[in-house]
Design a protein with these regions (language model features):
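Electropositive, gly/pro-rich neighborhoods at or near active sites that engage anionic ligands
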Residues: 44-197
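Anaerobic metallocofactor- and corrinoid-dependent redox/one-carbon enzyme cores
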Residues: 2-33, 37-38, 45, 56, ...
Length: 528
């Protein structure tokens, strides 16, 4: 639907669980930035259609589309001028591709045609578009490490081009599942990139105490930026603390070897305005999730890659983090040790239980299941957010029986990752598998267990209780649906962009259901 201001319903905390349509979104994105992102999306669709007509596929086209899709994710880019500049670059490429092929460039697509379409068509096209945005983030992280996959790269343009076509439920549902299939390949690629570059993650206990002295807090998902920052801070006396989804970096051998990588600062992304206020440190955002900074610390915030906020210093492609380091030295850090405990009062967290670690003890896990020591596995994973009701995930994990194992990943784990759930046969009951893209690890572990027990994944004593917030959660959900995973519990609310008709299909074919209460859901999942 066309609006005089913005229309955006891609994240979990949209206004009234419907859409953000006023002068700014709940995320803080102004209407002019939302409109610029729609214009950028329309320009990318035009580039995709022009390239298809010209029969052209190359890295330049893919890179522009990946950057554009990533830019439009929630809590990434709040700078309308930067978004418009990228749109202009996309248009220049569209004209160049057309000229080289001797054809007319396709006009920029008006995405209001999607927002105003039949609700089921709009729903499925939104699933595709938002899923592509999530997958693009993973493709970007792999790309900066030198890993690419032609199948993944070419799919972005192909899928975008299809969004401009009239479409039908019968055609768009398979396209949405194709996004899930391609995202699986992209997560596999990123897993290879991360482990090939930084080693196999290993169980690591991470402190939540900040030592005296100057320090930098690095947030986001980009391990490459962290590695560069660690290299540039050697010998400076500046310590590095991870934040949010950067926590799993502590488990990678090639990153944890740096002595200045000290610990983790704070809790999940949505608490940053409170936790960053008055902190004598520099903050570097490498990806989402950036919130509009408070004036009290805005001068200490730096962005890089596609992340941007007006007035905050942006570190360009040269990756010279000198200004960030200098700011940390100027601020000086704390005079005494300072601790920000987890939401349950814990002061340490453990990470590093990716597939390499879990599969290395697969025999022990299988034996524990066969002996009855482990009765059930729960994957409690996904995004955190500010909407009331997310304490459900804390209460759910606290209530899991002692003979069950909780696997987790992504930032939703901050609801409970400072808890000590004890052990089963030497194995911790709570295992953090990593970032959201490490859903690939969870999938591989599930597949390995299914093979060990000669059954399907849906037949395992395994339940998935997921939380979502932004578009990477969308592409992961599509991957799980592509794999045929059933009976997923999803919360804290269902996506506003999923129409009743599409929801009926997902419920009928995949058994997706909203979370209710921890007690009721636990009883159902355990068959009690």
């Amino acid at each position: 639907m066309a609006t005089e201001q913005m229309f955006c319903f891609q994240c979990e905390q949209v206004a009234k669980c419907e859409a953000c349509t006023g002068g700014a979104g709940v995320c803080g994105k102004p209407a002019d930035v939302a409109e610029a992102q729609d214009a950028l999306t329309g320009a990318m669709i035009a580039l995709a259609r022009t390239a298809r007509e010209a029969g052209v596929k190359n890295d330049r086209i893919c890179d522009l589309i990946v950057d554009g899709l990533f830019t439009c994710m929630t809590n990434v880019n709040f700078d309308g001028q930067a978004v418009t500049a990228l749109k202009d670059a996309v248009r220049v490429e569209t004209v160049a591709v057309a000229a080289a092929a001797g054809i007319e460039p396709v006009s920029d697509y008006d995405v209001d045609q999607i927002w105003g379409d039949d609700e089921d068509i709009r729903s499925l096209k939104s699933l595709v578009l938002f899923g592509l945005r999530g997958t693009a983030a993973y493709a970007d992280h792999a790309r900066v490490l030198g890993y690419r996959d032609a199948t993944v790269d070419e799919f972005f343009a192909d899928a975008l081009a299809q969004l401009a076509e009239p479409g039908s439920v019968d055609a768009l549902l398979p396209l949405a599942l194709k996004v899930g299939e391609v995202n699986l390949g992209c997560m596999r690629l990123l897993d290879e990139a991360n482990t090939g570059t930084y080693g196999t993650p290993e169980p690591t206990t991470v402190a939540m105490e900040v030592e005296p002295g100057p320090f930098i807090v690095i947030s986001g998902h980009d391990l490459h930026d962290l590695k560069l920052l660690l290299e540039q801070t050697e010998g400076t006396g500046v310590s590095i603390y991870t934040h949010g989804e950067m926590l799993p970096a502590h488990a990678y051998p090639e990153l944890k070897k740096y002595p200045q990588l000290k610990g983790n600062f704070g809790t999940a992304w949505q608490n940053q305005k409170k936790e960053f206020d008055g902190v004598p440190a520099a903050f570097l955002f490498t990806t989402n999730c950036l919130m509009p900074p408070k004036e009290s610390y805005a001068d200490n915030v730096f962005t890089t890659e596609v992340v941007a906020f007006p007035g905050c210093t942006h570190i360009g492609p040269d990756k010279d983090f000198g200004p960030v380091i200098q700011k940390a030295l100027e601020l000086g850090g704390y005079d005494e040790p300072h601790t920000i405990p987890g939401i349950n009062g814990g002061t340490t967290m453990t990470t590093g239980f990716a597939q390499g670690t879990v599969l290395s003890v697969a025999d022990t896990v299988v034996d524990a299941v066969k002996s009855g020591a482990i009765k059930h596995f729960f994957l409690v994973a996904g995004c955190d957010g500010a909407r009331p009701g997310r304490n459900y995930y804390t209460d759910f994990v606290k209530a899991t029986p002692d003979d069950t194992v909780v696997l987790t990943l992504a930032c939703g784990k901050y609801r409970f990752n400072d808890l000590d759930l004890g052990e089963i046969g030497g194995l911790p009951r709570l295992m953090d598998m990593g970032q959201c893209n490490d859903a690939y690890s969870a999938i591989q572990v599930a597949v390995a267990l299914a093979e060990a027990f000669d059954c399907g994944v849906n037949d395992l004593p395994l339940s998935m209780v997921l939380s979502w917030y932004e578009q990477k959660a969308v592409c992961i959900l599509l991957t799980l649906l592509y794999l045929g995973i059933r009976n997923i519990k999803l919360g804290p609310t269902l996506p506003a962009f999923v129409s009743p008709g599409v929801l009926d299909v997902l419920v009928e074919n995949y058994g997706i259901a909203p979370i209710t209460t921890p007690e009721a859901d636990l009883a159902e999942l355990l068959g009690e």
